[in-house]
């Protein structure tokens, strides 16, 4: 591990695994840039204007090669950045090294402890005598830390009853910070202009806060941009799920019976990926609309408890809690593969397995012996499998998502007075712009409306072409 100290603050300049990996990281970043036309177009468009000059961004998002391209785009557009990963297993160490080598503050390494994770999240918020004024979040941990910490400043008892290992580490990190600075969280929170949120789970947290009138600053829901959710969540998972399962286990997927739990965009992509390699795919759903969609796609829609003993590969994709319980786990067949592609690690009741015999096969692959004598293969300890056991989504699809992130950061930072403490989405014309920026790369050519055709369907020749309520 490499720690470099900053001259301005007690917070280190960066913490990474190995700075010698920076050349390797830089080579992969250069390749990724050729696959990320949206971000590169924004660099060209805004290079001289620097619309993020003065922005001080605290970023909490998987520290991958693709994220490195995002970070350097933000910096090119004028921002100062401090970055941490939003998952203990998702960092690509060579990507972190390449960013650190550019003098950018990054606190990320693959295989962090929970204590390190929350320490690093604190580091991106601690700018010494200065303050961050923007948050770029994935899962809502940076935003949530500020809110919970602010509550603890007034009433420390909110930290009295942690319910799991993650909360123990989180609560301890807040208590430690408050011992040295009793107003840290409220001071930082008061300087935040807004947050842009990347993923479904984090967006759900923001809407909960809005419903409670507890959102401390404006937020842009990047996840529900069409060019994010219908591309990253669907097409990204369609490629990265099977990539991670194959890298982790080397099993033949064809002929296996797989259960995908959740048939939202992530579940749809996951089911397609498994079917594409010849798996017999079943789907579990709570939503009758999604269940009907799954049935119309030819998947058997089942209940977990009815099929648990017959499934070879379990994939959770719900964003919910305790989707696979201890009762389900102990009934699984020998050598069943269990993994999660939702954001957090609580979809599978991993904690209930801690008293059984674990055999680590390789990083993020564990053999667990059940009371029945059967063994299951747990991937990434129930955390995001595609980033724990592989390298996440391909660069091209992440360019869609991250182009939305940059546009959202520019919008909030420059027009903060136009936004109340609510959750917003980017307007349709920006969604369409993001899509346009990616068409040339794949050789797609748009048909152009005539003026008469545009008038006939009551749209502009240049778009937007769909209503805000259109479901793609």
UniProtKB/Swiss-Prot annotation:
SUPFAM superfamilies, per the entry: Formate/glycerate dehydrogenase catalytic domain-like, NAD(P)-binding Rossmann-fold domains
Gene Ontology CC terms, in alphabetical order: cytosol
Cofactor requirement: NAD(+)
Range of residues in the leader sequence: none
Pathway annotation from the record: Amino-acid biosynthesis; L-homocysteine biosynthesis; L-homocysteine from S-adenosyl-L-homocysteine: step 1/1
Cofactor annotation remark: Binds 1 NAD(+) per subunit.
Catalytic reactions of this protein: S-adenosyl-L-homocysteine + H2O = L-homocysteine + adenosine
GO molecular function terms attached to this record: adenosylhomocysteinase activity
Keywords: Cytoplasm, Hydrolase, NAD, One-carbon metabolism
Binding site for substrate: 64, 138, 198, 228, 232
Enzyme class, first EC level, given as a word: hydrolase
Transmembrane segments: none
NCBIfam families, alphabetized: ahcY (TIGR00936), PRK05476.2-3 (NF004005)
Protein name: Adenosylhomocysteinase
Organism: Prochlorococcus marinus (strain MIT 9301)
């Amino acid at each position: 591990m490499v720690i470099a100290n900053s001259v301005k603050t007690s917070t280190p300049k960066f913490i990474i695994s190995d700075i010698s990996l920076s050349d390797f990281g830089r080579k992969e970043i250069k390749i990724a840039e050729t696959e990320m036309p949206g971000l590169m177009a924004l660099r060209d468009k805004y290079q001289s204007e620097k619309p993020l000059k003065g922005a001080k961004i605290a970023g909490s998002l998987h520290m991958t090669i693709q994220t490195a391209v995002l970070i350097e785009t933000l910096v090119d557009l004028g921002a100062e950045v401090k970055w941490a990963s939003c998952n203990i297993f998702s960092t690509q160490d060579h990507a972190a090294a390449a960013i650190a080598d550019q003098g950018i503050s990054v606190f990320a390494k693959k295989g962090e402890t929970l204590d390190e994770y929350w320490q690093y999240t604190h580091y991106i918020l601690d700018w010494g005598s200065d303050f961050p004024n923007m948050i770029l979040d994935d899962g809502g941990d940076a935003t949530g830390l500020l809110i919970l910490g602010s509550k603890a400043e007034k009433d420390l008892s909110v930290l009295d009853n942690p319910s799991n290992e993650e909360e123990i580490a989180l609560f301890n990190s807040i208590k430690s910070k408050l011992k040295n600075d009793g107003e840290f969280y409220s001071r930082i929170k008061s300087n935040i202009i807004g947050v842009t949120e990347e993923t479904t789970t984090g967006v759900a947290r923001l809407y909960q806060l809005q419903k409670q009138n507890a959102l401390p600053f404006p937020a842009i829901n990047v996840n529900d941009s069409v060019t994010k959710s219908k591309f990253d969540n669907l097409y990204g998972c369609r490629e990265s799920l099977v990539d991670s399962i194959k890298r982790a286990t080397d099993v033949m997927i064809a002929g296996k019976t797989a259960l995908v739990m959740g048939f939202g965009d992530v579940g749809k992509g996951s089911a397609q990926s498994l079917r594409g390699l010849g798996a017999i795919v079943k789907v579990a759903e709570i939503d009758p609309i999604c269940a009907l969609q799954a049935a119309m796609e030819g998947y058997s829609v089942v209940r977990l408890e009815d099929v648990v003993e017959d499934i070879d590969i379990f994939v959770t994709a719900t964003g919910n809690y305790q989707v696979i319980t201890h009762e389900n786990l102990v009934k699984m067949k020998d050598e069943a593969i269990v993994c999660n592609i939702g954001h957090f690690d609580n979809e599978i009741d991993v904690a209930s397995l801690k008293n059984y015999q674990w055999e680590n096969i390789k990083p993020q692959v564990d053999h667990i012996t059940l009371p029945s004598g059967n063994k299951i293969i747990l991937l990434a300890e129930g955390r995001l499998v595609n980033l724990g056991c592989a390298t996440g989504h391909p660069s091209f699809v992440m360019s869609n998502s991250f182009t939305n992130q940059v546009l959202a950061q520019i919008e909030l930072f420059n027009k903060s007075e136009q936004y109340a403490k609510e959750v917003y989405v980017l307007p349709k014309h920006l969604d369409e712009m993001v899509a346009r920026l990616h068409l040339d790369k794949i050789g797609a050519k748009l048909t152009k409306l005539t003026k008469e055709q545009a008038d006939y369907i009551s749209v502009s020749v240049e778009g937007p072409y769909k209503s805000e309520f259109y479901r793609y």
